[in-house]
């Protein structure tokens, strides 16, 4: 029926190359606007609970915690997941040397995924409608869509014509980890235990979101910069570390797991035994190995490529650089907060929410959005509509997130200090700082709108790419001229590979002297070769001149 439809209806099932990836990425950018709006509104309602009181006449009572939950669902499942899955629909076929198994399936499933996120957002505001829990329904729809995505990617990998690079395996393992961890959590009873809920939340974050985001970011960093990945070993460390360690990013509780699994989970207070505390702290500290491996690999691969805003061929590099730089300091802060929760001290619980939002908008969103922007020209065949709008989008999102969340965290520290000193009256300065922080975070909303409009408009009005951009490393991949003693590590770090041919250049360390013109004429100027034109079998041809021909020529010139 859709094939016979006019306009967009037929486009959905036409199966054009790259249509599935484009559909996921464009919907992910639109979710970025809603995610930033929900997060900004929740921050504003924190210091002004009655700001949206007029909506009560329509039956909607705005609550800061509920809107914050909606912002998390829209950010993780609406924006980040769709950007990662959409980028994966382009990356895995490229690395496998084949085409996506079904572009039509990828295109249609994107709308099913969007519908599941809508249900999750609605459930975050009112989880019980007509006696039915809404969030588990959204989770079930999301699982069906993810199952279709996994089948599509597995069929694509099955038809590969060459071995797939490690970033592709990172994306594939991220997709497979979601249903596997869900089944394991249900069978083991982890969803019905407070510690199990906390553990499931962070395992989902590490295996699904961290692995998926790092996979697309590593691929995009190599494509955008034109440099090969600095170290394949570090990619392997990132791959195994995302599975075998506990990711410290995110909330310090398992409320999301409890909401997602609905009747299978009970509301429990997080309480760790001494053995659980030691194991969790050790595995979270161990997570710094893949985090450092990813950050160093990204930064070295992208060396000298942070000026994307002036070149339409390199969109997204600034976002990728931002995420790679900030992942380590935010991970350190998250480790302190999570360890504080695990140990039961709860002295840093006041900054947990701000740090969780910071990890979303300064690490996960920039990396996933930067990867999508880097793949944009190849997916659409056009440049972004406006480089200036891309530059302003980056500056507004980055400046708004850093300044707004940092100021909000300062207010959190002030409130924590007042609680510790048992001061009952709230601080007026803290309230003012929260107002300033929420106003600054509004820049993220504006930046999201800039990016989304720029990408959607660029698809129709962006400058056509006349020829494929030629990306090269700092040295030629085919050859490398060795002019001085150098280690193999330095040669490989410069962009060479195992197939690069190294040519040693001879050096003479003797004392230099002036070269005479006579010596130069004898040794440096190559001899001139003469040819004689003659007629052979009725056709004019050429042969090398011999001594007789030269003597004859010289005698004729003398006469």
Regions found by a protein language model. Give the residues of each.
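Hydrophobic alpha-helical transmembrane segments of multi-pass integral membrane proteins
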Residues: 1-559
